[in-house]
Structures are given as C-alpha cells and as structure tokens.
Design a protein with these regions (language model features):
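Small-residue-biased structural context
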Residues: 2-169
Length: 169
C-alpha cells in the first residue's frame, strides 16, 4: 500500500470509518426494505439480495480482515482491550454466518421460492441490529484505542499486510 507513519494510521482509519459510513447507508436501505416486508408490501428483493452479496463479500472478507490486523496489534499494547478485541473477533465470525443465512433466504426469494415473511424479516432485522451494535463498539471503543496505542511501525505493518482491495461501493 506504500503507507507509512501517521499517514498510514490516517489512511487505514479513514478507510475503516468510510466503510462504516457506506455500510450504515446500506443498513438503512435494508431496514427500509424490512419495513416493506413487515407491511406485507412488495419489497425489492433483488436490491436486498445485491446488498447482501456485497455485505458477505467486501466487509466480511476485506474490511474485517483489516480490522482484525489493527485489533491484534492493539491487544499487544493494551491488555484492557483484549476482551473487546476478542468479542469483536467473535462478532466478525457471527456476522459472516448471519449474513450468509440471510443471503441464502434471499436467494430462495429471488428464485421464486416461498419464504415466510416473518422469518425473513426477523432474520434481516437481527442482522441489521447485530451489525449496528458491532460497529458502535468498534467506533466508540476499539478504534479510538487503536489510534492512541499503535505506533507508526504498527501502522506500517498493518498497511504492508493489506492486499490492495478497493471497496466496490
């Protein structure tokens, strides 16, 4: 990535925060579509499906990998952060499972299969709320700690570990 020092931290953290903004926008759209499902109107299931395809690819495979690298460095410096870092790691795995479960339901719907509205809505809302709660912990706790604790060399290490992947949103 060719990032060093303070610039490296800025670039990495700006990307993570930008990703969260994009993800939050998508969650608003998902929530709107779950409201449509709840009201027994015709949701745009292809849109919801496309959002979940994105969510189960970029955030689950790239964004969370970068966070995990940052959080691992953080846990090396801040023993009080180990609990939240461990929690966030477990949540990354949980988010991937929840996302794939929701995506599988959406594939069935898009393919014309019958899926109970309340099951679909509850699965969608559970995913949305879990992800929002997860990002809130990162933004209020883990990100600020990492920004304070990691050295320039740590940010260089993280940057050199990141594959050059561009967020498709």
């Amino acid at each position: 990535m060719g990032i060093d020092g303070e610039n490296g931290m800025s670039t990495i953290m700006e990307q993570l925060k930008s990703d969260h903004i994009n993800i939050s926008r998508l969650l608003v759209t998902l929530e709107e579509q779950m409201d449509v499902v709840h009201d027994e109107r015709n949701a745009d299931f292809e849109l919801v499906h496309d959002i979940l395809v994105y969510m189960t690819h970029y955030p689950d495979h790239t964004h969370h990998t970068i966070e995990d690298l940052v959080f691992q460095k953080l846990s090396n410096y801040d023993s009080t952060a180990r609990s939240v870092v461990s929690q966030l790691g477990r949540e990354h795995a949980g988010l991937a499972k929840k996302g794939l479960r929701f995506l599988e339901m959406l594939r069935h719907v898009v393919d014309g299969a019958l899926v109970e509205r309340d099951v679909l809505e509850n699965t969608g809302r559970d995913y949305i709320e879990f992800l929002r709660s997860h990002m809130a912990i990162e933004e209020s706790d883990a990100f600020p700690r990492a920004e304070r604790a990691l050295s320039d060399e740590d940010w260089e290490d993280v940057a050199s570990s990141i594959e050059a992947r561009i967020d498709p949103v």
